[in-house]
């Protein structure tokens, strides 16, 4: 009799994806982030569902409904903070996952990589709209500032912004539609993640050496299932430490003040995971230029396969490229720091230099360094 795991139409899909999947024998913990992102997504959908049961998307009651969740709903406070800090964990895993892909040359799997970039944009859009929902000061002004950026688009800009707002300012219509989109997008993300996985399993996983590992594969279960469970436990440990000991560490105190269109907060800034892009946006004095730089700072990932000039796939045996990669990582941390600072003397120039460095490293220095390394090996 055939094993039900291998014969049942549904079980067969699960089996081929998570049990009998041939995986390289040498993939490191950097390959854990895919499964961690899956766990984050499930966690966000579940906590979000329970929050949506008590939330009201009306400008008059949105803020007080969130307060009601924290004070009156059974375990509402933990659900709310797991959802808020779960977003931070999601982005930590996302950036690590993308960084891993850049370091080990995983972007040569074109379909997988491009769907990954689309996923990144979708998750960023979802997180932005979710931040608007509590209707605090930073929610309102963040929504106003970021949606206003679209007015930089020539000719149709202003009409486009008013169409998104559903009026002449961020108001009830905006909040309601943002709630609707924030609810539906995670399911679209889940579907895209399955397509992402489908394309990955067409080629098989990359590995730290970047060399094909077809002759040295091991079954995913039990080797990588147990490894993923360890990663998941660490993720949940860090998340619960945040939730139970410092739930507001990564948030903005301004968001505990109800939204007031007549009072602008002194420093409008997004959540920490968008600060690097926000710093790039602010470093260009021109509005349209800033918006283009902001979009291109993420869209540049699409160009990674085109910018790959090395004869080797991975950076494992390329010390000069490794050095540049970690300079890029430090540069992104610098941009994140600058994004949270006020627009005044030392910060403006630091932000501009860090922004130039970001594009220079990816577009010029990395491809040039790869060519130099090729010449070292007489290739």
Curated annotation (Swiss-Prot):
Its cofactor is heme b. The keyword Transmembrane applies. A ubiquinone binds at residue 201. Heme b b566 binds at residues 97, 196. It is a multi-pass membrane protein. GO terms for cellular component: mitochondrial inner membrane; respiratory chain complex III. GO terms for biological process: mitochondrial electron transport, ubiquinol to cytochrome c. One of its GO terms (molecular function) is ubiquinol-cytochrome-c reductase activity. The chain crosses the membrane at residues 33-53, 77-98, 113-133, 178-198, 226-246, 288-308, 320-340, 347-367. It is found in: Mitochondrion inner membrane. Pfam families: Cytochrom_B_C, Cytochrome_B. Binds 2 heme b groups non-covalently. Keywords: Electron transport, Heme, Iron, Membrane, Metal-binding, Mitochondrion, Mitochondrion inner membrane, Respiratory chain, Transmembrane, Transmembrane helix, Transport, Ubiquinone. Heme b b562 binds at residues 83, 182. Heme 1 (or BL or b562) is low-potential and absorbs at about 562 nm, and heme 2 (or BH or b566) is high-potential and absorbs at about 566 nm. Belongs to the cytochrome b family. The cytochrome bc1 complex contains 11 subunits: 3 respiratory subunits (MT-CYB, CYC1 and UQCRFS1), 2 core proteins (UQCRC1 and UQCRC2) and 6 low-molecular weight proteins (UQCRH/QCR6, UQCRB/QCR7, UQCRQ/QCR8, UQCR10/QCR9, UQCR11/QCR10 and a cleavage product of UQCRFS1). This cytochrome bc1 complex then forms a dimer. Component of the ubiquinol-cytochrome c reductase complex (complex III or cytochrome b-c1 complex) that is part of the mitochondrial respiratory chain. The b-c1 complex mediates electron transfer from ubiquinol to cytochrome c. Contributes to the generation of a proton gradient across the mitochondrial membrane that is then used for ATP synthesis. This is Cytochrome b. It comes from Tragelaphus scriptus. The gene is MT-CYB.
């Amino acid at each position: 009799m055939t094993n039900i795991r291998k014969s049942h139409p549904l079980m067969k899909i699960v089996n081929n994806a998570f049990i009998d999947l041939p995986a390289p024998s040498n993939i490191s913990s950097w390959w854990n982030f895919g499964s961690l992102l899956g766990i984050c997504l499930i966690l966000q959908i579940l906590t979000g569902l329970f929050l949506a049961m008590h939330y009201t998307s009306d400008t008059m009651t949105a803020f007080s409904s969130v307060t009601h969740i924290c004070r009156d709903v059974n375990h509402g406070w933990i659900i709310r903070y797991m959802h808020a800090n779960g977003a931070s964990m999601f982005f930590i895993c996302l950036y690590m996952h993308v960084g891993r892909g850049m370091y080990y040359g995983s972007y040569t799997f074109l379909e997988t990589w491009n769907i990954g970039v689309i996923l990144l944009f979708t998750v960023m859009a979802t997180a932005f709209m979710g931040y608007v929902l509590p209707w605090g000061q930073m929610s309102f002004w963040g929504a106003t500032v970021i949606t206003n950026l679209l007015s930089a688009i020539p000719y149709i800009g202003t009409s486009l912004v008013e169409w998104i707002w559903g009026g002449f300012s961020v108001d009830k219509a905006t909040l309601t539609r943002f709630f609707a989109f924030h609810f539906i997008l995670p399911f679209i993300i889940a579907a895209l993640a399955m397509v992402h996985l489908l394309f990955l399993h067409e080629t098989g996983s990359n590995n730290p050496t970047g060399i094909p590992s077809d002759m040295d594969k091991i079954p995913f279960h039990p080797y990588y299932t147990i490894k993923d469970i360890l990663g998941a436990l660490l993720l949940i440990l860090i998340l619960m430490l945040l939730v139970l000991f410092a739930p507001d560490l990564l948030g903005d105190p301004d968001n505990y003040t109800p939204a007031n269109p007549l009072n602008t907060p002194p420093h409008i800034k997004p959540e920490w995971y968008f600060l690097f892009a926000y710093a790039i946006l602010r470093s260009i004095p021109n509005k349209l230029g800033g918006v283009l730089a902001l979009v291109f700072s993420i869209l540049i990932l699409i160009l990674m396969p085109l910018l790959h000039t090395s004869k080797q796939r991975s950076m494992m045996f390329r010390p000069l490229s490794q050095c540049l990669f970690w300079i890029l990582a430090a540069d992104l941390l610098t941009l994140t720091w600058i994004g949270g600072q006020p627009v005044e003397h030392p910060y403006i120039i630091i932000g501009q230099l860090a922004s130039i460095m970001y594009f220079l490293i990816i577009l010029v220095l990395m491809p040039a360094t790869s060519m130099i390394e090729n010449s070292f090996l007489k290739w």
